[in-house]
Amino acid sequence: MVFRNLFFVPYGWFKLCWYASHAERYSEEQRYQLLKYVDNRAVKGGNLVIDGHGMENIPKENGFIFFPNHQGLFDVLAIIQVCPVPFSVVAKKELTNVPFLKQVFACMKAFMIDRDDVKQSMQVIINVIKEVKAGRNYLIFAEGTRSKDGNHPQLSLIHI
């Protein structure tokens, strides 16, 4: 994957860092198109084929939340690949220490949640609810972390 994108990686990294540090200059659609472009390069470089099903179930109007199970590290890339509308994410704050993810989250204007701080977590939830009601879309992995063994906890309905 790296060899196939050898010349793209420096350009893509610079552009992603620029968009992340100047996110307010670009519309959500422009930032999402950059992420889709980077995602497409990663998918093609890895000789992967993503076959999405159920896109007709994605609401036509903005202001919704995806609540998928977190199967593995490729989940968000697969969702970006098939989702036609921009979305942001709620992620654990520890991921801001990971290069590349830090820039992706800044570009998406993601909310970072501290799972050890209940007050901060509640404030993030309140802010996400306000943004969803204002028409922004979000992706939240409800069980909190990816499944390393394929077993997921039983989830119940969440009402906003």
Segments from the language model and where they lie:
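Membrane-anchoring hydrophobic helices of lipid-metabolizing enzymes
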Residues: M1-F64
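Soluble catalytic domains of membrane acyltransferases
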Residues: G45, V49-I158
